[in-house]
């Protein structure tokens, strides 16, 4: 096992599984980012609380760094109150592989409704991350979610070619997004993009609804 070379204790190597489960629980709960100051601190708090208090902060940090630089997890930024100058680069993390995400989310006992929503959101994260690789299509160094007036918007993206700002909401069912609608109405963005699993799609003014499986073909112009 390649990772074992970086860790000296059996507790160290088990931290990977603990981190995966903790990521799932964070993704499944309603939140505005981590309660701690960093991904490492939030995950360490969960890992030591739920699994073993013997796992050190240094071990947790090493494991998270290894997972990130190996392309197994990715970080998501937080934009507070739709202000792109208030940009916190690592406020959430996602899996970079949908099979891995499905496996661990299922093992945490996630019910089917929540599972579908979380997997859809993870899929959109991966798609946005690819659009920031060369040649980049959208702004920011990582995908980002946003907060606004006490609510949360799944993702915020901005076109590099036109500076058009998109609010992106990922819905597994027929839900609406009141926070995103409010931000759009108050001029905080140019468009609202709904990505849904069961829809034929359509355009209503500045709001566009798209079947999530067509996201790969969508262009942020």
Please describe what each predicted stretch is:
Residues 171-220:
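Catalytic cores of nucleic-acid endonucleases
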Residues 113-114, 167-171:
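Short, glycine/charged-rich beta-strand-loop motifs at protein surfaces that mediate ligand recognition
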Residues 157-167:
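Active-site beta-strand-loop-beta-strand hairpin of nuclease catalytic cores
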Residues 90-91, 163, 190, 205:
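Sequence-level motif detector for i,i+2 pairs with an aromatic at +2
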Residues 110, 161-163, 174-175:
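Short, surface-exposed beta-strand-loop junctions and turns on beta-sheet-rich folds
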Residues 1-153, 157-159:
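Accessory nucleic acid-recognition modules appended to NTPase machines
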Residues 144, 166, 191-194:
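A structural signal for isolated positions on well-ordered beta-strands in alpha/beta enzyme cores
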């Amino acid at each position: 096992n390649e990772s074992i070379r970086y860790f000296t204790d059996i507790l160290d190597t088990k931290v990977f599984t603990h981190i995966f489960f903790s990521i799932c629980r964070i993704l499944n709960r309603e939140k505005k980012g981590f309660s701690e100051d960093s991904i490492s601190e939030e995950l360490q708090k969960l890992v030591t609380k739920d699994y073993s208090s013997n796992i050190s902060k240094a071990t947790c940090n090493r494991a998270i760094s290894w997972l990130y630089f190996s392309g197994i997890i990715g970080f998501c930024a937080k934009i507070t109150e739709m202000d792109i100058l208030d940009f916190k680069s690592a406020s959430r993390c996602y899996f970079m592989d949908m099979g891995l995400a499905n496996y661990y989310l299922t093992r945490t006992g996630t019910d089917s409704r929540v599972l579908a929503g979380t997997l859809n959101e993870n899929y959109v994260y991966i798609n946005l991350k690819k659009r920031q690789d060369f040649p980049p299509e959208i702004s920011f160094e990582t995908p980002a979610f946003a907060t606004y007036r006490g609510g949360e918007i799944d993702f915020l993206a901005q076109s590099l070619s036109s500076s058009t700002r998109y609010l992106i909401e990922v819905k597994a069912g027929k839900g609406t997004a009141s926070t995103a609608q409010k931000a759009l109405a108050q001029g905080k963005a140019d468009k609202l993009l709904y990505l849904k699993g069961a829809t034929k799609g359509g355009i209503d003014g500045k709001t566009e609804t798209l079947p999530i499986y067509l996201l790969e073909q969508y262009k942020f112009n």
